[in-house]
Amino acid sequence: MKKFKALLPIFIFWASIFAQDQFNNEFDYSQIIKVPDLSFVNQVYTGLDILEQMDFRILENKTIGVLCNQTAVNRNGRHLLELIGTHSNIEVAAIFEPEFGLWGIDDKRTKLIGNDRIDPVTGAKIYSLIERSVYPPDWIMSELDIVLIDIQDTGVRYSTYIPSITKFLESASDHEVSVILLDRPNPLGGLKIEGPLPRTEYQSYEAYHLLPIRHGLTIAEIIIMVNEMGWVKDLKRANLMIVPMANWTRDQYFDDTKLPWKKPAPYINDLHTLLMFSGLDLFRGTNINVGFGTDHPYLWFGSPWLAAGYFSEKLDRLKLPGVEFKEVTYRPVGSPYYNRVPQYDGRSCSGLEIIITDQDLVKPVETATTIITLMNQLHPREFQWRGHDYIDKLFGSDMLRVFVAQKKPPSYLSPQWMHDEMKFSEFRKSFLLYN
């Protein structure tokens, strides 16, 4: 960090040059804030790091709202709200929190004053975009000049952060409020794409936009796509500005960036958990326990009726890339991640541990659909879909459920979404900010 601090005068010099024409007009409705070339510094800097080095000048004398959570930290682990709180000429009038809250489900640092939750650093009231309404209140939006957004996305379509930001763009458009989004890495890298595109009739918060399950985009690249393509309701566009990262490349996973890891969701403990989440979150649409009620969500799965030894032998014969399986016996007890009881709570489960042997080769969606297909074939009476075909919303179509019913070999399924992957890979090119 000392090397980068030494660059601060140079950075401000260039920032002042760009002050007259600081935006890239490559897009019709979205602007990229220009920052100096820092390629000679061998470190990744998030949009927050860049904004901090600009001394938050674009926010001076503005009334702002902030949409963020616990992941909005700089390279040194300091939170966005803490950093802004040191600037008396920036007024934070409202804080908006996505799913799982501002600080995560276990953190109680917000103050309760009457019925209002207050951030102790900025003194701003906190509004949830999940619990009562998916939109921010109209009366507070009418008071804002800018909404600042900083959230570490998962890189996986199931997450609700992108839908929440999309709803925010709609409200910002209605109230003519500018949106500044600070970019962060896709923790799963920017090269791999896996899974089908959702069909329109199956779109939901888990499949909100036309993205593969693993999309390989940063949060800014997705939101630019949403804004440019008119994917906001009624083709609304926001005055969107992006503070990009410096020195992130698409071949980098999160552990390559040397940035501090903050769980993007309370059940995602590390990068390997996140990798398997991109496939095994489909198990929420089945009666298979996916490690909830244990310390190994998405890396363990099982049930009281699974013949784990025989099932492991069948999986090993399929030679799924980048993974190995090991038998485990466990008893799920409660869950710190949701206010709900995990499947088979308190019951002994036979299961398998997923061991990632090569994160560059593993295909989590193919792994998950193979397990589901094989589970149905080996345990046709015990295996069940849950929640009125909830699996269709997670998957984005009824393709998986229909395929499982047809009893075809598991390896026949993934080629069916290969065309979607190729089509999306070509489509996304014009929205990529990084090489």
Predicted regions and their residues:
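Bacterial Sec-dependent N-terminal signal peptides
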Residues: 1-30
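Short internal beta-strands
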Residues: 91-101, 182
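Glycine-rich, charge-decorated loop segments at or immediately adjacent to ligand/cofactor-binding or catalytic sites
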Residues: 104-108, 180-202
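Glycine-rich oxoanion-binding loops at beta->alpha junctions
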Residues: 112-144, 156
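Glycine/threonine-rich flexible loop motifs
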Residues: 153-165
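Conserved anion/nucleotide-ligand pocket segment
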Residues: 203-277
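Glycine-rich, aromatic-lined ligand/substrate-binding cores of catalytic
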Residues: 248-333
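Conserved functional hotspot residues or short segments at active or partner-binding sites
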Residues: 302-415
